[in-house]
UniProtKB/Swiss-Prot annotation:
UniProt organism field: Ruthia magnifica subsp. Calyptogena magnifica
SUPFAM superfamilies documented for this protein: Class II aaRS ABD-related, Class II aaRS and biotin synthetases, TGS-like, ThrRS/AlaRS common domain
Cofactor(s) recorded in Swiss-Prot or TrEMBL: Zn(2+)
Name the record gives this protein: Threonine--tRNA ligase
Cofactor binding note from Swiss-Prot or TrEMBL: Binds 1 zinc ion per subunit.
HAMAP family in UniProt: Thr_tRNA_synth
Length: 632
């Protein structure tokens, strides 16, 4: 006689073993119809799952995040079924859920084309209309191996062979299609109505470049067709804002094969970077940071001592000289500790704040590189605060306020905060980690702001606070971090003399606000769609003439505006004024200054604001005052 406790505390008593579906029906037919799965004592199960003893139960529907994940996973299996119906020689491998969708990897020697995607998607919709029942059943490991061998599914067989002997495995059947899966799945294919196949890509079997290349099919799936349409609209908008497209139009940067993952900054793009750095330098100065600069190449022995070699050796660029091994720095922290170690410090010297626009290199896999968002060479607004344990909370609190202020200045008002705790492979004792995690949690609680845990996502040397921006499309970008580190300063012999004249090890707070400068520029490009705030835009105004008669006047105006500290260019080409205006409007310059005979006679300019608004005629002095007020 199981007693089922629902999320609101309501209890239902049943005379015998009961399924999740039956419990849902006892609550209401509409809930039973909407049910996709159940959560029994914290474990997700199918709606057919039988509850034999007292249990806590939540009915999972498409309105839940967990329900959406089940929809996406079930749609991945629907994709596999539809594909094998059309292409029987295609072998299935894996099909996990990812952000906003799913993918499935196939082994298919003939390869899929874009036209194949349309056929597969059409077949998926046919299977949805058939409303196939999705059923779970079990096999022993040996039975499953033989079953998939007989089907010619050698990759699936390899997966099962890697599972420890003696285990019972779950499989799912829909129509004639059977696949290995832990589940749960939706009960019927008719529950899967809002999906779209997005693209094809290559992927190595088990992520190893020595293995065979697979065909990866990406898709997206949602609870409703409206949700799907909204997502596709967001993707269209994101494509329009793609920093790679805008970067080319605005002549900001380029990337080429000879330097994969490394940026060739053009003049305007580099100006944008420098403006960001100048602003952040002011932030450093106002908050008592000492800006430093450290070497790019450092002996391997330091990276071994710091722990980076063990954790990141595979992603570090290395070289040798005079029988010594060096690594190009992937991060700046060990180098900053070397600066700290020059001269014994007193407790009166703490907190000591060091900052650097440090150029770092990481050998990211070529397949993960993406414009300036994911690169191999990047600059960080890196900083390290050396302090005592008693100073942690104040320093963390100050940094949180500072970070929010910087983001607001760049136009980001929506920021989520996450506290990432110790990963499995971490250095330092659990006692030290307990202390570090508690220090960050206390600092966050003291700020009375919303935050959430991310278990196991901390750095190998300490827990961290992550600052996640939301852009105009509600996309999330993790930028800022603050990490408490009790381990590395001890490993690298950092010390200070306390008030009792005893040597102690300082705590190091690793902190960055923007993170990768390259990535932050990419975020800004897409957030503003190239129409940056006036203080940040590489070119604030372009001066154009209507005819050749005004050429000297345009040159004179441009010089005057530059002397006032404005970033201005001129366009004296013998082109029609309409052509010039259209061309410079595409560059998203804040102002186009037009000069004709009337303006030249009165020593004035006609001002056109970004977006096409005509501000009329004004003096050069009035324009300078206007733009300065806007910047302030």
């Amino acid at each position: 006689m199981p007693i089922i406790t629902l999320p609101d505390g309501t209890q239902k008593i049943f005379e015998q073993v009961v399924s999740v579906t039956q419990v849902a029906k006892s609550i209401g037919l509409s809930l039973a119809k909407a049910a996709l799965a159940g959560e029994v004592d914290g474990q997700l199960v199918d709606t057919s799952f039988l509850i034999k003893t007292d249990a806590n139960l939540a009915i999972i529907t498409a309105n839940d995040d967990k329900g959406l994940e089940i929809i996406r996973h079930s749609t991945a299996h629907l994709l596999a079924q539809a594909t094998q119906m059309l292409y029987p020689k295609a072998q299935v491998t894996i099909g996990p859920v990812i952000d906003n969708g799913f993918y499935y990897d196939f082994v298919y020697k003939d390869g899929f084309s874009e036209s194949d995607l349309a056929k597969i998607e059409k077949n998926m919709h046919k299977l949805v209309k058939q409303n196939l029942k999705i059923e779970r059943f079990e096999m022993s490991r040996n039975e499953a191996i033989q079953f998939f061998k007989d089907k010619g599914e050698y990759y699936k067989t390899e997966i099962i062979e890697s599972i420890p002997a003696g285990q019972t495995l779950s499989l799912y059947k829909q129509g004639n299609f059977i696949d290995l899966c832990r589940g749960p799945h939706v009960p019927l294919t008719a529950k899967l109505k809002a999906f779209k196949l997005m693209k094809l890509a290559g992927a190595y079997w088990r992520g190893d470049s020595n293995n065979e290349m697979l065909q990866r099919v990406y898709g997206t799936a949602w609870a409703t067709k409206q949700d799907l349409e909204e997502h596709l609209h967001r993707l269209e908008e994101a494509s329009r804002r793609d920093h790679r497209k805008i970067g080319k139009i605005q002549d900001l940067f380029h990337i080429q094969e000879e330097a994969p993952g490394m940026i060739f900054w053009h003049a305007k793009g580099w100006t944008l970077c420098q403006l960001i750095e100048q602003y952040m330098r002011g932030i450093f100065k106002d908050n008592d940071y000492q800006e430093v600069h450290t070497p790019q190449l450092i002996d391997k022995s330091l990276w071994e001592k710091s722990g980076h070699w063990e954790k990141f050796g595979d992603t570090m660029f290395t070289t040798s000289s005079e029988n010594r091994d060096y690594a190009v720095k992937p991060m700046n922290c060990p180098a900053h500790i070397q600066i700290y170690n020059q001269g014994l410090k007193s407790y009166r010297d703490l907190p000591l704040r060091l900052a650097e626009f440090g150029s770092c290199h990481r050998n990211e896999p070529s397949g993960t590189l993406h414009g300036i968002m994911r690169v191999r060479n990047f600059v960080q607004d890196d900083g390290h605060i050396f302090c005592t344990p008693e100073q942690i909370q104040v320093e963390v609190s100050t940094f949180i306020d500072l970070t929010f202020a910087v983001y607001k200045h760049f136009g980001f008002d929506k920021v989520d905060i996450k506290l990432s705790t110790r990963p499995e492979n971490h250095v330092g004792s659990d006692e030290v980690w307990d202390k570090a995690e508690a220090a960050l949690a206390e600092a966050l609680d003291a700020k009375v702001i919303k935050w959430e845990f991310q278990k196991g996502e901390g750095a190998f040397y300490g827990p961290k606070i992550e600052f996640v921006l939301k852009d105009c499309l509600e996309r999330q970008w993790q930028c800022g971090t603050l990490q408490v580190d009790f381990s590395m300063p001890e490993r690298l012999d950092a010390q200070f003399i306390d008030e009792n004249n005893i040597k102690q090890t300082p705590v190091v707070l690793h902190r960055a606000i923007l993170g990768s400068l390259e990535r932050f520029v990419g975020i800004l490009i897409e957030h503003y769609e190239g129409a940056y705030p006036c203080w940040l835009t590489p070119i604030q105004a372009v001066v154009i003439n209507i005819s050749g008669k005004q050429a000297d006047f345009v040159i004179d105006i441009t010089k005057k505006l530059k002397k006032q500290g404005l970033r201005v260019i001129s366009d004296l080409r013998n082109e029609k004024i309409g052509f010039k205006i259209r061309e410079h409007s595409l560059q998203r310059y804040p102002y186009i200054l037009i000069v004709g005979d009337r303006e030249m006679e009165k020593d004035q300019i006609s001002v056109r604001q970004r977006g096409g608004k005509d501000l009329g005629v004004m003096s050069i002095e009035a324009f300078v005052e206007k733009i300065n007020q806007e910047i302030l």
